[in-house]
Amino acid sequence: MNAPRLLVDIGNTRLKWAWCEAGAPLPASTGTTVLPTPWQHAGAVAHAADGALRTLAAELRALRAGGPMPSVWISNVAGPVIAAAVDAALADAFGGCAPVQWVRSAAAHGDLVNGYREPTQLGVDRWVGAVGAHRWLPRDTLLVVTAGTATTLDIVTVAAEGGARFEGGLILPGLALMLGTLARNTAQLPALDVGEAGSVAGAQRRWADNTHDAIAAGCLAAQAGAIERTWRALGERGDAARPPRCLLSGGARGALAGALAVPFEMHDNLVLLGLHAMAMADA
């Protein structure tokens, strides 16, 4: 890699980014290791916050430090307005137009086939996250959970004869959205944030004895129940000696982690990992 790479995951609320230095060594792929973070710098901003993209541009400018123009790989689910704002921030950061790949969902990537009825209608973040997970865990059935504004559960299966398939999945309101909806649409229920809900999960009480904790426990149980039910269904149809691997990512992953009763592994951002895999395949 003769030039750095900038990976950008534009979600509904936050923009997450990672910077891969030119010439940085890649982690080895064993198919059994924990998922890597093959970048040297990373960060996140609330993209609608005043001045957030200007601050990001300044940080990226400092990382480039007059060196080669980076190639940029972007996954965007926030729509065209934020896309234009990010384009402007990149021009501000680099003093010109860096080569940008706006990733779209496709029928396949490598040996991973997109099993969606209309492959291009699959949310690009879900597709890219699955690509990233499968790139590093190519022999495993995967339940990819991304806990963001929405919580998505995506399934990747591996055929005995080779090849893999994105089977589809589930979408449910994210933890913050569940908590906020209760507060906004009821007269007397209090507002909770994700951190407060996570502390209730950590308390390990079976039943809540107050309204605050009952809301947190109920929303966490809904999220965890969907994950656990899907994980068990995958296990029932697969190889008992090689259970599915549940991968937990997204901003609310820490809160959900305390509520789950199935084995899981956490990664900071599977979408960035997928963008990295796509960029390397294109090199």
Swiss-Prot record:
Active site per database record: D125 (proton acceptor)
Cell location: Cytoplasm
Reactions accelerated catalytically: (R)-pantothenate + ATP = (R)-4'-phosphopantothenate + ADP + H(+)
Main location: cytoplasm
UniProt-listed InterPro entries: ATPase_NBD (IPR043129), Type_III_PanK (IPR004619)
GO terms assigned for molecular function: ATP binding; pantothenate kinase activity
SUPFAM superfamilies: Actin-like ATPase domain
One example of a Gene Ontology biological process annotation: coenzyme A biosynthetic process
Keywords: ATP-binding, Coenzyme A biosynthesis, Cytoplasm, Kinase, Nucleotide-binding, Potassium, Transferase
Cofactor annotation: NH4(+); K(+)
Described function: Catalyzes the phosphorylation of pantothenate (Pan), the first step in CoA biosynthesis.
Family of this protein: Belongs to the type III pantothenate kinase family.
Name of the featured protein: Type III pantothenate kinase
Organism from which the protein derives: Cupriavidus taiwanensis (strain DSM 17343 / BCRC 17206 / CCUG 44338 / CIP 107171 / LMG 19424 / R1)
Lineage, uppermost ranks: Bacteria, Pseudomonadati, Pseudomonadota, Betaproteobacteria, Burkholderiales
